[in-house]
Amino acid sequence: AALAMGLQYLGMSEHGPTSPGGPHNFFFSNYKVIPRIYDREENTGRVIPKPDGSLRLLCGVEANICSTNGELDLEERYLQKMDYALASIHPFAFTAGSRKENTLASVRAFQNPYVKILGHPDDGRFPLDYDELVREARQAQAVLEVNNSSLNPQSARQGGRENITELLKTCMKYDQPVIMGTDSHMCFAIGAFDDAEQLMRELE
């Protein structure tokens, strides 16, 4: 799907081990055997590993934030081997606290030297102080995700559009970069940034 869309990079970030049905730590250790560059075979059109290919695969993790200390569910010895790592709050791994507590947990998570992305900081079930979050992210040289799936009316996250709008306005205030994510749980959602792009254009 990524090659068909002409994408140059595809990030794969499996959820951390505490997720229901989540992978064991060994899953992440096994990333070392996965080729990172792909293209289509000329004769068959099959997608194959190819050193000079046009698509680079990045193997990462979406680690679960487990406490207000920013504790993650994947040890640093695994995190340091990832191509990239993001951290996110999920209800199965983190008990919602006050706005201050949720913000503290998020900030401490991306202060981890191996985490440079905070995933979907837009769920109304876990309210955040965006002003503090953005200032701390800027200082830590971390980026905040604009999650396309959070804008889907069927998303379990609450207040996605309103919260992402507030987040983006705060990022604009502090000149803080963001990263768009599709949160693709199926191949047909790869590269689908339509809702996020539309919202960002509206705020230009």
Residue spans of the language-model regions?
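Residue-level detector of anion-binding/catalytic polar loops
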Residues: Q8-Y9, R56, V143, P177
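Short acidic/histidine-rich active-site segments
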Residues: H15, Q176-I190
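Ser/Thr-glycine-rich phosphate-binding loops at phosphate-binding pockets of nucleotides
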Residues: A1, Y9-E14
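Short gly/pro/ser/thr-enriched loop/turn and capping motifs at secondary-structure boundaries
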Residues: T18, A93-F94, L151-P153, M186-F188
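His/Asp/Glu-enriched short active-site or ligand-binding loop at hydrolase and phosphoryl-transfer sites
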Residues: V143-A156
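Histidine/acidic-residue-rich catalytic or RNA/ligand-binding cores of hydrolases
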Residues: G21-N25, P127-R135, Q154-T170, C187-M200
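C-terminal active-site rim and adjoining tail of enzyme catalytic domains
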Residues: S149, L168, P177, G181
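Extended substrate/RNA-proximal surfaces in nucleic-acid metabolism proteins
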Residues: G16-V146, R201-L203
